[in-house]
Amino acid sequence: DGLSPIEDDIHIVYKKVKECDALILASPIFFGSLSAQTKIMIDRFQCAWVSKNILKKDIFKKKKTGAFICTSAAHRKDFFQNARSIVRNLFQVINAKYEGELFCPGLEKKGEVKKYPEFLESAYDLGKKIASAAKDLRPS
């Protein structure tokens, strides 16, 4: 049926994702990919993937928009590309159009992003883009 048989908080996450107009997912890069916490949450959508792609029953019918924000201490594009591919797969499962992304390399410490006004400006612009796209999805 596309729902996980494990009784934990993923059912709350599924409900929120079903109801949302937009989703911005953010994660740091650890060991060349998404954080373990982010990845395990995405892995819990495997039941939804099976439902949509094997059983042909889409439990995330509502169209939505989405974006991905990712930070890394390293300046490795391949790390970001790896994370992006995982997030794009999630967005396909939940019917979210991948509207944009923000990759912020060179960030090691908490608050360090404040030294990079270009990252802050890009994050603001991405937020405006996602809000506009979500508004366009709502019925008039």
Where are these regions (language model features)?
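Glycine-rich phosphate/pyrophosphate-binding loop and the adjoining helix
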Residues: 88-140
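Helix-loop-strand module that forms the ligand-binding subsite of alpha/beta enzymes
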Residues: 5-92
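Glycine- (often His-adjacent) and acidic-residue-rich active-site loop
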Residues: 1-3
